[in-house]
Regions:
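N-terminal domain-onset segments
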Residues: 1-43, 49-50
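Short, compact, well-ordered microdomains
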Residues: 51-87
């Protein structure tokens, strides 16, 4: 079987590595900042998601789902899945 996503509107913020205050305002207590090593050090936002901790790297989007759940999304996947809406 195949399924299509229902057309929903989600809130999104992009993690730049420099916008920690905006990310904190968007995510609330569900985010922490630090460095991960892969193997070089990279600034990261650690997000508490429904599946556990996930990391957003600079350039990634953080999406707030329909029930307020948070999850990171890589830019290429975001571009294929979402489009801007007029407010």
């Amino acid at each position: 079987m195949k399924y299509r996503k229902k057309p929903i509107v989600v809130e999104v913020i992009r993690w730049t590595g420099d916008n920690g205050k905006e990310i904190e305002a968007f995510c609330g207590a569900d985010v922490m900042f630090g460095t991960i090593y892969e193997p070089d050090p990279v600034s990261a936002a650690c997000i508490h998601t429904l599946e556990g901790k996930m990391y957003a790297r600079p350039g990634d989007y953080i999406i707030k789902g329909v029930n307020g759940e948070l999850y990171p999304c890589k830019p290429d996947v975001f571009a294929k899945t979402y489009e801007a809406v007029e407010e």
